[in-house]
Amino acid sequence: MTESFTRRERLRLRRDFLTIFKEGESLQNEYFVVLFKKNGLDYSRLGIVVKRKFGKATRRNKLKRWVREIFRKSKGVIPKGFDIVVIPRKKLSEEFEQVDFWAVHEKLLNLLKRIEG
């Protein structure tokens, strides 16, 4: 299995996001809300939604890079065949400057492992 994050593994279309928001199931912890829905494919796709309230663009982009990296490196433990949308919560925004990559990694990976169809 390759560790790249290919174009086909990205959620890009508005209708895909809307379908997940409407019909998807959710999991959450203090840092993230994860929405997911079966996609009928043999691989999972990732979408990230970060509101402007989270902070300035550099901060939002840093979080998105972290989430993509966690997804990319953890493909082996994330169930296949799901569309996944990750949304950060307010607590992560408030603590973002004090939190390191590995704390975010642990919190997000715990949620992603719980995805089941």
UniProtKB/Swiss-Prot annotation:
Domain of life: Bacteria
GO annotations of cellular component type: ribonuclease P complex
Presence of keyword Cell wall biogenesis/degradation: no
Keyword Hydrolase in record: yes
Gene Ontology molecular function: 3'-tRNA processing endoribonuclease activity; ribonuclease P activity; tRNA binding
BP-aspect Gene Ontology terms: tRNA 5'-leader removal
EC number(s) from the headed UniProt entry: 3.1.26.5
Enzyme category, top tier: hydrolase
Catalytic activity: Endonucleolytic cleavage of RNA, removing 5'-extranucleotides from tRNA precursor
Keywords for this protein: Endonuclease, Hydrolase, Nuclease, RNA-binding, tRNA processing
UniProt-listed InterPro entries: Ribosomal_Su5_D2-typ_SF (IPR020568), Ribsml_uS5_D2-typ_fold_subgr (IPR014721), RNase_P (IPR000100), RNase_P_CS (IPR020539)
Subunit: Consists of a catalytic RNA component (M1 or rnpB) and a protein subunit.
Record's function text: RNaseP catalyzes the removal of the 5'-leader sequence from pre-tRNA to produce the mature 5'-terminus. It can also cleave other RNA substrates such as 4.5S RNA. The protein component plays an auxiliary but essential role in vivo by binding to the 5'-leader sequence and broadening the substrate specificity of the ribozyme.
Family (UniProt): Belongs to the RnpA family.
Database matches in NCBIfam families: rnpA (TIGR00188)
Protein name stated in the entry: Ribonuclease P protein component
Encoding gene, per UniProt annotation: rnpA
